[in-house]
Amino acid sequence: MSTSRSTRHQPGWGKPVRLMLRLMLMGVGLGVITGSALKLLAPQVEKGQLSLPSWLALPGSENAPAPGASTQPKAAAQPSSQPWGNSLGKFEAKREMTALTERWRQLAAQQKDLKVSAFMLVLDDGRFAALGADMPLPAASSIKTPILLATLELLDSGQLRWNEPLTLTKTVVGGGAGWMATKPLGTRFPTHEVATEMIRISDNTATNLLIERVGGKDVINTRFKALGLTATAVNNWLPDLEGTNTTSARDLARSIALVDTGKALSTRSRDLFREVMGTSVTNRLLPGGLLKGLGGEQGKPDDSLMIKGYRVYNKTGDIGIAYADAGLIELPDGSRAVAAFVVKGPFNDPRSTELIRDMAAAMAPVLQPKPAPRRTS
């Protein structure tokens, strides 16, 4: 009897190779599909409009859940409890602080022969006080604030360079405050120096140089009207001791607020505006009055206010028959207010400046922020 060997076919390498090729092709296909899907969905993930599953989010990324955290959909984020948030605020009077307005009225009534224009607005919530806020009065040097704004508008439009030289001519030489008038005709000053000296020491010749560079009185007045400064006008070269240049408390406050709320000027020019306004050396009216209301020492208003968390960027005016001061006030909680005062009265009458200080002092109670809540661990 013969024995027979099994004739069953022995498996070779064909099937495993084919299986591996199929798996590789499937992997490549799935990779292409997944990559294309992620590319299409990436913008939505980046904007937070679509959450990645926990197994796909990178550790430490915004979309990655904390260890042990629930993967259930999150409720919509609640608005910040911070009252001013990221808003720059608005020049919009919403709710009158009648007690402050009445206090101003009482102070003004004690000096019946003085004409008063006063305005204050908290940019972050719209609280305001006003007394004769739109009354046109002699602007004195307070008009230099809107002139600075008009100058920086040219910078933004590319019609002016910050280092452009301005030439001293006989037309623009002005008496009174400043040193530029003492230089020989033909002297050239860079625009940044002219603008700074106009605010820092209230140089009248510097102011006239900028009025001329903007295009003259008619052109700058047109710009004022376009900015909504309806009571503000340059009718004479500085120093304008006759008081023909006019403004109002609301206009002065508006010219500052338009910059700080981003309604006028670029971010860079806004920074220049603040930088220049911060150089003003006269601080006895608005800053001094505010410090008085806060109960501080009167030696150095700016330094004393800073210790208390306040900062005032202001510009004054003084032609004897009229005094003014207007500025941006930064408060300890980060919110901001604008305030302006213009008083017309007898020549060099100390009651005018004292009235501005008293009215500024009256603002202190409403500008003191509430204590910050204590953090709980």
Write out the residue ranges for each language-model feature.
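Acidic/histidine-rich, surface-exposed loop or edge segments in extracytoplasmic proteins
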Residues: 76-89, 122-132, 178, 201-203, ...
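Short alpha-helical patches at coil-to-helix transitions and adjacent helical residues
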Residues: 142-145, 200-207, 246-253
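Short, conserved catalytic-motif segment at the N-terminal edge
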Residues: 109-136
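Active-site-proximal loop and beta-strand segments within enzyme catalytic domains
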Residues: 155-197, 205, 210
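Active-site SXXK
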Residues: 126, 137-168, 339
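N-terminal post-signal-peptidase region of extra-cytosolic proteins
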Residues: 102-104, 132-136, 150, 324
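Penicillin-recognizing serine hydrolase domain
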Residues: 2-114, 185, 192-195, 209-377
